[in-house]
Amino acid sequence: MNIDKFTAHAKSVIASSQSIAAKNDHQQILPLHLLSSLLSEETGIIQTLINNTGGNINLLKDQVQLELNKIPKVQVEGGGQVYSSAEALKVLEKASSIAKDSGDSFVTIERIFEALTYGNTIAGKILTNNGINSKKLAAAILQFRKGKKADTESAENSYDALKKYGRDVTELAESGKLDPIIGRDEEIRRTVQVLSRRMKNNPVLIGEPGVGKTAIIEGLAQRIFSKDVPESLMNCRIIELDMGALIAGAKYRGEFEERLKAVLGEIKESSGEIILFIDELHLLVGTGKTDGAMDASNLLKPMLARGELHCIGATTLDEYRKYIEKDAALARRFQPVYVSEPTASDTISILRGIKEKYELHHAVRISDSAIVAAATLSNRYITDRYLPDKAIDLIDEACSRMKIELSSKPEELDELDRRIIQIKIELAALKKENDEHSKKKITHLTEELEKLESKSYDMKAKWQAEKSKLQQAQKLKEELERARIDLERAERDANLAKASELKYGIIPEIMKKIQEAESMDNKGLLKEIVSESDIASIISRITGIPIDTMLSSERERLLVMEQKLRESVIGQDEAIKGVSDAVRRSRAGIQDINRPLGSFLFLGPTGVGKTELTKALASFLFDDRNAILRIDMSEYMEKHAISRLIGAPPGYIGYDQGGVLTEAVRRRPYQVILFDEVEKAHPDIFNIMLQILDEGRLTDSQGITVDFKNTIIVLTSNLGAEILVNQKEDEDTYKVKDEVMEYVKAVFKPEFLNRLDEIILFHRLNRNNIHDIVKIQLESLKKILLAQNILLEFDESALNYLAEKGYDPSFGARPLKRLIQREIQNNLAKMILAGEISSGNTVKIAREKEELRIKIID
């Protein structure tokens, strides 16, 4: 007997039998140990053979263990050596003989198993008693191997290769485990056309991630199952290749190729009845490639070209270009089928189709408004991913969140139970006191506790009743799903009696029961319907945009936009109106959707509220004053500095880092972008801005397109400021607009100015404006001090004093901030540090003669 002629798995079984003998303190390896080792082997071959011959593996294991326990134990200090018995060697010799007679070059585990049925051993008797004899086993092995010979050391890996390294998609369709596919008829038809060709009948689905490439294959599998395909594909099966399983554990050179050849061999033998589906097709290129070895794609090429292999691939546009197109020989064997992103309305249809599957899985209900919101809001707010994937994810996560809430205690009941615990703790502490006040308190708390416990009991009963009703509805839905699968099977098998019973009897009855179970009062403790607000809440967490801005309440907010902006921006009513009108046009959907929400050029002297209006705009639209990307254009005075905005070109330092502008917008697509002091930048920078203002997008140095459609572009400039400063106090700003525009046209090109929504002039501030700004600044200081529990008060005299001293038409409101720091904040800081003002004090600011006084009231 030559041990080198045993396969790796056979050697492993022999080694394992030695371990079993040593573990049981047996001196010899007997056929019984070999049988015990075979029953525990990992490939599943022996289990399949036992099942095919009518045996029971668990029964065999118990009987073998019983016999092993009967063998005398020999305990040797330090562990004795285990020898092979003559019987075990005879079994292995017999296995070699059977393998040779069968034309095998190597002895496999099933041949050792077959050899155990010969001879008069305990192991042989156990097998015979369980109905497994040499004749039956030889027939089972022949059927299992399908005529294959053991020619390599890893021969077991090539048995039933498709089952090991593939997933039968058609079988999943048959068992109803696939989601229904809505639409995509054109892509499925084109795929069927390519598959029906004589040569090069291999379609490759190319599309962006998440557009539904794999779903098309599932749709095709469902059509094959329901016989809704041409006759040539009627009996086909779609097997998805598991590249991970194919590569995993392939330790030796040639083992991976051997596995793949076994898969391809089975497909070839099926005479066109098996269609191989390879998801992430680009993984074929380079897989299994080692020194001198061929990669997977080269093994496939001959069969692909001859039409012996029906193969469907799926990959993204980028990976197809990067891997497949580079290998022209591989690319020509596949016929591209381009899969585009569905529209929002198509996505709504898709979501309605798969709604029931998600309701069944999560045990919740999904409203139609939630489906519409998922499609429209994801399309608008999640710009870096594709429909329908991003919309399905929103529905899935909203359902998951609802499911978690349903399984936990309702908030109202939880608060009630916490209050009961709190009262019980109070009562325990008060019982130790003997005074009259404590006794009254005990009486009062005891009464409250009784009421709360009664309320809690009723609420718990109501909660449990609602919960059991939901569980009942869920069981009925599962029953309905099974009935529908049975109906499909009955219709396919032409079992009309069963089909009519299911269609007109069982299914309507279950549906009636579901309607009764779901007729729950909406005012109950448990909310089981996923609504539009739940979807908006999920998007809010992803993007950081407040929920209110996504739902219908936004309409009311937009109508009072001017009023809200005037609360923080004083004296610039024309500017506020211009900005508000542009934002309303965009939000109402009557502006070009491929442009930013608004683009403005703010012109005016320093300190009049240009930047403040930008912050107020961010606060109003995104509920965050810091939702601003501020780019100081004085940093981009040189031509080469422009590349910092979109990223350094290939070959330059910083290429991998991305651009200041593009990366910030990619990470946070909803913000106000402020280009400050824009006239100081190099003129070439406006060429980049043309694309943003016109198309609402910009391509960075790495070829990634960044979406600016949900941003507001604000450019500020001091051009023509001297004209606006020298204007009379109450003169209309637009009288001098033409003069200011002469300065603007001298710096900016007409094509740039034409793309802006509004050019807004900010006039200089008058004394009344300054008075209002003083009030806002002091209110802001009041809030800061309130955090330290110090109350700040001020009267009209203080406001007038600061307004008079802080008014400078040339510098706007900026001197006012410095004045408040000098006159108030500096003195307050000294008093706080000296301990004159402490927590709980009230401080009043008032004018005395020609200066401000800070008084501590208490």
Curated annotation (Swiss-Prot):
Region (Repeat 1) location: 6-71
Cellular compartment(s): Cytoplasm
UniProt keywords, alphabetically: ATP-binding, Chaperone, Coiled coil, Cytoplasm, Nucleotide-binding, Repeat, Stress response
Superkingdom: Bacteria
Residues engaged in binding ATP 1: 207-214
Domain annotation Clp R: ranges: 3-147
Region C-terminal: start-end pairs: 765-858
One annotated GO biological process: protein refolding
Spans annotated as Repeat 2: 84-147
Chain residue ranges for the region called Linker: 342-544
Domain remarks in the Swiss-Prot or TrEMBL record: The Clp repeat (R) domain probably functions as a substrate-discriminating domain, recruiting aggregated proteins to the ClpB hexamer and/or stabilizing bound proteins. The NBD2 domain is responsible for oligomerization, whereas the NBD1 domain stabilizes the hexamer probably in an ATP-dependent manner. The movement of the coiled-coil domain is essential for ClpB ability to rescue proteins from an aggregated state, probably by pulling apart large aggregated proteins, which are bound between the coiled-coils motifs of adjacent ClpB subunits in the functional hexamer.
Subunit structure: Homohexamer. The oligomerization is ATP-dependent.
Protein name in UniProt: Chaperone protein ClpB
Taxonomic source organism: Rickettsia felis (strain ATCC VR-1525 / URRWXCal2) (Rickettsia azadi)
